């Protein structure tokens, strides 16, 4: 059952990044995409907790894939576009370093969070994504 769920998730990631991302990104700039995709991802991560049967996860997992699939490349595009051309490489390198550090933290604190409640990691991660979304949409330089 777990293998089928991960296969299904992988299929949706491939569809999102292989078929949907390019045409959508060609028509819509990164900021409006991020306004929607970050919100979708935060809600979808927490939405994983809602189904009481594994079969219902098949309805939620595409939302996670869509949120993640549109957020990551558009965040990178936004960072690249905001950087001065002479600093792009350095800024993208710093971004990668921060991203790597951010991926180090969940395994370090995950056990503690799971010990509090088995649902806590999804609630905490979804909350942080929603906090990032709120910070993003509140930033004056990204308002239309």
Could you say what each language-model-derived stretch is?
Residues 125-144:
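Multi-pass alpha-helical transporter architecture, strongest
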Residues 112-129:
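A membrane-interface helix-boundary motif in multi-pass transporters
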Residues 1-14:
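Loop-to-transmembrane helix entry
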Residues 32-47:
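Structural signature of the two symmetry-related core transmembrane helices
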Residues 70-83:
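Intracellular juxtamembrane helix-capping segments at the cytosolic ends
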Residues 16-30, 114:
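Helix-to-loop junctions at the C-terminal end of transmembrane segments
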């Amino acid at each position: 059952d777990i293998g089928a769920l991960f296969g299904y998730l992988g299929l949706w990631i491939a569809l999102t990044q292989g078929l949907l991302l390019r045409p959508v990104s060609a028509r819509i700039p990164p900021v409006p995409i991020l306004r929607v995709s970050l919100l979708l991802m935060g809600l979808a991560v927490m939405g994983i907790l809602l189904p009481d049967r594994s079969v219902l996860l098949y309805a939620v997992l595409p939302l996670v894939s869509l949120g993640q699939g549109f957020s990551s490349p558009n965040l990178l595009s936004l960072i690249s576009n905001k950087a001065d051309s002479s600093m792009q490489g350095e800024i993208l390198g710093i971004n990668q370093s921060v991203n790597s550090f951010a991926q180090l933290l969940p395994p370090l604190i995950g056990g503690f969070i799971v010990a509090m409640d088995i649902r806590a990691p999804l609630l905490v991660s979804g909350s942080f994504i929603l906090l990032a979304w709120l910070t993003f949409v509140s930033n004056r330089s990204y308002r239309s």
